[in-house]
Each structure stands twice: as structure tokens, then as C-alpha cells.
UniProtKB/Swiss-Prot annotation:
Catalytic activity: S-sulfanyl-L-cysteinyl-[protein] + uridine(34) in tRNA + AH2 + ATP = 2-thiouridine(34) in tRNA + L-cysteinyl-[protein] + A + AMP + diphosphate + H(+)
Protein name, UniProt field: tRNA-specific 2-thiouridylase MnmA
An individual GO BP term: tRNA wobble position uridine thiolation
Family named by the database record: Belongs to the MnmA/TRMU family.
Subcellular location, principal: cytoplasm
Annotated stretches, region: Interaction with tRNA: 136-138, 290-291
Species the sequence originates in: Nitratiruptor sp. (strain SB155-2)
């Protein structure tokens, strides 16, 4: 008898091919699509793709409306973070509090042990690892998964290169149009840019002061929520300067602090809200402070839910609210939120 598995399906090529791959390995695939926001046109297009795949594979699929839960657990905290002068990482948060939690709970309702997604990552049931395709690796966004979920998760695309997934999908007539469609943006509820999302909920266009590290007013900006640490454009300085970067954001004063690249340098970072797969309290490893940055060697000391990180080489653009993820080569050891 074939083993059942619940597959998160988005209507894109990765999750569609994941379902196809698992069926070819003998699994009885049950597809599930989760609505996380009220953009109905977006959902209808995705569900139409899932219907195609389900028909081709002869599998059942379910549509779960989790708009209310997403609003409370991910969307509102995203808005609140920017209002507080932080730079949030909604995908890493969503993977923990929404996507995988809802997927596991739905599998439990059906009495199914395993779940799968089209993420480019690997797991051995204890740790998460980088995908073979480093250009598409999503392990950074998965550091926050509950440890007890890992033995139940399968990432079939962990050893695949994206270009090969698309090539193979193109060979299957009903998947061809899905393989040809444009890739979706990283943040599913952001159609254009995050500022447009914020404008729906709060005042964003608020001209304010640009100050140097001594508090001297040296320019003006268009509203602090437009900026993140390390940004060097979008504000005006009264006099010509060497390139200046955002060093800090002071929301209650609607101010941004700017300085030189040297002043942007960090060699110490503190993380809170840790999620660790490794039990050690002190260790050497690598840290990644943004999705598209390289890993930096560091020394970590953990005290409760706080990690003090000493970097062995400087990093720039460390933004409060972003995820700091610990690696041992390709293995994800855990991580937390930069404060």
C-alpha cells in the first residue's frame, strides 16, 4: 500500500513538480493550497494551476482559508515592525507560525505522518541543510521551524537545480505552462513593494530630519519607514559628502542617523527569540545576517533566549528585525532575530 503524504501546493512549478516527483516515488499525494491574504485574483490563478496538476496526477487537493490567522500572526506584525523602525523577515516568521504549522495540523487531521514542500533545502529529521542549488537555497528562511516538525518534513527538491526542475516540468504537457510562468516574489502579500502595503495601514510619507552620529541635523528624508540599515539612497544631505549610509532609525523622532561605511561596520551582534536545533551554549560557526549575503565566521554564546555573537570579520548593514542564522558549513544550527 502506498504511503500518504500532504504536499503544500502554491500553483508554481516547484511545488507542482514536488507533487509529481513524490507520486513517482510511490507516495499517495494529497495537495493543499493555503490562502493567506484576500487577493482573490491571485488565488484563483494559483488554484487553476493546482487543478491542472491534480487532474494530471489523479490526486485530491484541498483549499484552506487561513486569511484571518495570517493577518494576526504575520501580516500585522510585519506592519508593526516597520512602524517600530525594524526590518522584518515575514517569510521566516510565516514558515514557523503559519505554513508548516497549518500543514502539520492538516496532516494530523487526515492521519498522515509526512508533509512536503517545494522548498530548496534538505533535512535529516534533526537539522536543516542548504540545498544543492546554492542560488535557490532557502534554508535561511527555515531556521525558525519547530524542532519537532523536522522528522515529518520532506524536501524533495533539496538535491535538484532549479533549471533542471523547469526542464523536467516542461516535458510534462500539463506542467509546461506552469514551468513557463514568471517566478513569484519572495513576499506573497506584497504586489509591488512593502511601502505600498504600509500605506494601507499607516502614514508613511512623513518628511523628517537626517542626523549624523552626534545628533547634528545634516539633511532631510521622506519618512523613516522608507529606510533600512545600510541604505544609501532616498535621503537628501544639505552639503556634498562622501557616500552616507543609514546607521540607525529613530521612529519616535522620525529621524534617521547616517554615517560612513566605516561607521556601518559591526563586529558584535545580539539575537533574541532563538530557535536552536543545536543544544550547545557556546560554539564557533558561521552566521548569515540577510538572505543574499555570504556567511561570516563567528563565536556564539547563548544565555537563555539571547545569543551574543562575536564576528571574526566585519559585516555591514546589520538591520534590527532581520534573521541571524547560524551554520556549520551547510548545516543550519538555528538562529534568532537581530536586536
Amino acid at each position: 500500500m502506498s504511503k500518504k503524504i500532504v504536499v503544500a501546493m502554491s500553483g508554481g512549478v516547484d511545488s507542482s513538480y514536488t507533487a509529481n516527483l513524490l507520486q513517482s516515488r510511490g507516495y499517495e499525494v494529497i495537495g493543499v493550497y493555503m490562502k493567506f491574504h484576500p487577493r482573490e485574483e491571485y488565488h484563483q490563478k494559483n488554484i487553476a494551476n493546482i487543478q491542472k496538476v491534480a487532474k494530471h496526477l489523479g490526486i485530491e487537493y484541498h483549499v484552506l482559508d487561513r486569511t484571518k490567522e495570517f493577518q494576526e500572526r504575520v501580516y500585522q506584525p510585519f506592519v508593526d515592525s516597520y512602524v517600530a523602525g525594524l526590518t522584518p523577515n515575514p517569510c521566516a516568521m510565516c514558515n514557523r507560525v503559519m505554513k508548516f504549522t497549518e500543514l502539520i495540523e492538516f496532516a494530523d487531521e487526515l492521519g498522515v505522518d509526512n508533509v512536503a514542500t517545494g522548498h530548496y533545502a534538505k533535512t535529516d529529521g534533526q537539522f536543516i541543510y542548504e540545498a544543492t542549488d546554492k542560488s535557490k537555497d532557502q534554508s535561511y528562511f527555515l531556521f525558525n521551524l519547530k524542532k519537532e516538525f523536522l522528522p515529518r518534513i520532506i524536501f524533495p527538491l533539496g538535491d535538484w537545480y532549479k533549471e533542471n526542475v523547469k526542464k523536467e516540468a516542461m516535458k510534462i504537457l500539463l506542467l509546461k505552462s506552469i514551468a513557463e510562468q514568471k517566478e513569484s516574489s519572495e513576499i506573497c502579500f506584497v504586489e509591488t513593494n512593502y511601502i505600498d502595503v504600509l500605506k494601507e495601514h499607516t502614514e508613511v510619507e512623513m518628511p523628517g530630519e537626517v542626523v549624523d552620529t552626534h545628533g547634528k541635523v545634516i539633511g532631510e528624508h521622506k519618512g523613516y519607514m522608507h529606510y533600512t540599515i545600510g541604505k544609501r539612497k532616498g535621503f537628501r544631505l544639505f552639503k556634498a559628502h562622501q557616500p552616507h549610509y543609514v546607521l540607525d532609525i529613530i521612529p519616535h523622532k522620525n529621524r534617521i542617523v547616517v554615517g560612513t561605511k566605516e561607521q556601518l561596520e559591526k563586529r558584535q551582534i545580539v539575537l533574541r527569540g532563538l530557535n536552536m536545533f543545536l543544544d550547545q551554549k557556546e560554539f564557533d560557526c558561521y552566521i548569515k545576517i540577510r538572505y543574499r549575503t555570504h556567511k561570516v565566521p563567528c563565536h556564539v554564546k547563548i544565555d537563555g533566549s539571547v545569543a551574543s555573537v562575536t564576528l571574526k570579520e566585519p559585516v555591514y548593514g546589520v538591520a534590527k528585525g532581520q534573521a541571524g542564522v547560524f551554520y556549520d558549513e551547510e548545516k543550519v544550527l538555528g538562529g534568532g532575530w537581530i536586536v
